[in-house]
Design a protein with these regions (language model features):
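Conserved catalytic alpha/beta core of Sir2/sirtuin-type deacylases, generalized to analogous enzyme cores
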Residues: 2-325
């Protein structure tokens, strides 16, 4: 097991023990009682830390995509209506995830919805917060860790710089995990969308099936069933683990963006542990709802409460202005 996966396993056990605390929007970790710096000073400190860092690890979660308009997962937003309107009108869905959990009466309509869901993320443009983040990271040695499955990061960076530890909407797996393989999902999704047209169902012959056992395919993502934790899964963890091992003695900046209360064990709490254990590590989080800075790293981090898109834009501008000072 790689070092980062081991950290995740450790924090998952903590999450299970204190589930009710996390489910109510809290954390089981004792938080700092220090008063946060004013926003403008936080941005200046952020800029300074980026400039001084010898390497950076960015942990990008759902709040990052939501800040750029990818906010259709949990609620009935304009973007949800834009992409899923025909299903919302027919079934009364109030967010994309509610449709993914729905038991459709036919597999044809189930796959019509899945294809719509995957097509929405596969073909989404690179969202503005990601572009601002890219400008902030220019000239730096960095690695991306993400729980997002929406392919935003791999539209900007080469695969070797991104660890997608929760899966990727570009791939299918066998729903029965009969083989340790993943297959392309982009072309099958495009074919289903074309065949579906204005309707909500795809024809039988386009329902994706495993070439080995004949079972239906399944999106290679955690959250809906038998997530294949095989070779590709381990490769994603190996990338981030090797980066940490290679840079553990350098001045490393850990940036956490948009972690919610459902998945603190994949980015947030491992970042806290790394900040504490690595001598020259520093931690910065940005979140629109939670301002969590553990007491045990209160002198090695800051937590910024604010819209992630706004913070990244302000940070980019401040970084660019500082280059001319």
């Amino acid at each position: 097991m790689s070092c980062y996966e081991n950290l995740v396993m450790k924090t998952q056990m903590n999450y299970s023990r204190h589930y009710s605390t996390y489910a109510s929007g809290g954390t089981a970790v004792v938080l700092s009682k220090q008063k946060p710096l004013p926003y403008e000073e936080q941005i200046q400190e952020f800029v300074r830390r980026v400039q001084e860092a010898e390497c950076i690890i960015v942990g990008g979660a759902s709040g990052l995509s939501a800040a750029g308009g990818g906010d259709f997962y949990y609620s009935d937003t304009p973007s949800f209506r834009e992409h899923f309107g025909k299903f919302a009108d027919k079934y009364g869905f109030k967010g994309a995830f509610s449709g993914m959990m729905h038991r459709f009466s036919t597999r044809n309509e189930h796959w019509g919805y899945v294809a719509t869901f995957l097509n929405t993320t596969q073909n989404a443009p690179i969202r503005e917060p990601y572009l601002d983040l890219d400008r902030i990271l220019q000239g730096k040695d960095f690695h991306i860790l993400t729980t997002n499955q929406d392919t935003q990061f791999v539209k900007i960076y080469p695969e070797e710089k991104v660890s997608e530890i929760q899966g990727d909407h570009r791939f299918f797996q066998c729903s029965q995990c009969c083989q340790d393989e993943t297959w392309d999902a982009v072309q099958p999704v495009a074919d289903m969308i074309a065949a579906m047209g204005e309707g909500t169902m795809v024809p039988d012959e386009l329902i994706p099936r495993c070439p080995h056992c004949g079972a239906e395919m399944f999106s290679w993502v955690r959250g809906y069933g038998n997530f294949l934790q095989g070779k590709k899964y381990e490769e994603e963890y190996e990338k981030i683990s090797k980066y940490i091992q290679k840079n553990k003695d350098r001045k490393i900046l850990l940036i956490e963006l948009g972690v919610g209360r459902m998945t603190p064990m994949f980015i947030q709490e491992p970042f806290w542990e790394l900040t504490n254990s690595l001598k020259d590590a520093y931690y910065i989080s940005v979140n629109s709802e939670y301002q969590f800075l553990p007491e045990f790293i209160e002198d090695k981090g800051i937590a910024i409460l604010g819209d992630i898109g706004t913070v990244l834009k302000d940070l980019r501008k401040a970084k660019e202005e500082s280059a001319f000072v």
